[in-house]
């Protein structure tokens, strides 16, 4: 398995920010339509991360025009242009699947506050 590990290590991204479930992300995705390509931003909160290494994925959920939309991205995929962390969420679970059933203010995620002293 050491040969597979070295092949996998060559295809890992190094520009992935640290994020976890509950964080709000902007995922910039390259969309190819025929000969044209454009970057589309998908903004939502992270439901969870699965897997490890080159097979690692994360699921982002947003509500668009009253309809919940979930999209699962491979972390090390070449179609992802960049990942931006907008806010850090204060949650106590690794998987937020219960958020699918919540509506309105109940579906709000508290923002994690940073208590480091600013000097």
Curated annotation (Swiss-Prot):
What residues form the membrane-spanning segments?
none
> What task does this protein carry out?
This protein is located at the 30S-50S ribosomal subunit interface and may play a role in the structure and function of the aminoacyl-tRNA binding site.
Stated name of the protein: Large ribosomal subunit protein bL19
Annotated InterPro entries: Ribosomal_bL19, Ribosomal_bL19_CS, Ribosomal_bL19_sf, Translation_prot_SH3-like_sf
Origin species? Pseudarthrobacter chlorophenolicus (strain ATCC 700700 / DSM 12829 / CIP 107037 / JCM 12360 / KCTC 9906 / NCIMB 13794 / A6)
One biological process GO term for this chain?
Answer: translation
Matches recorded under SUPFAM superfamilies: Translation proteins SH3-like domain
Gene Ontology MF terms: structural constituent of ribosome
**Which keywords has UniProt assigned to this entry?**
Ribonucleoprotein, Ribosomal protein
């Amino acid at each position: 398995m050491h040969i597979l590990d070295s092949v996998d290590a060559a295809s890992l991204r190094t520009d992935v920010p640290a994020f976890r479930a509950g964080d709000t992300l902007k995922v910039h995705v390259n969309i190819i339509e025929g000969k044209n390509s454009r970057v589309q931003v998908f903004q939502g909160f992270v439901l969870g991360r699965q897997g490890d290494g080159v097979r690692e994925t994360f699921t982002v959920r947003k509500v668009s025009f009253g309809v919940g939309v979930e999209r699962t991205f491979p972390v090390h995929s070449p179609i992802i242009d960049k990942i931006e962390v907008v806010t850090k969420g204060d949650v106590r679970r690794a998987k937020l699947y219960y958020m699918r059933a919540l509506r309105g203010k109940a579906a709000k995620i508290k923002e994690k506050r940073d208590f480091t002293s600013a000097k």
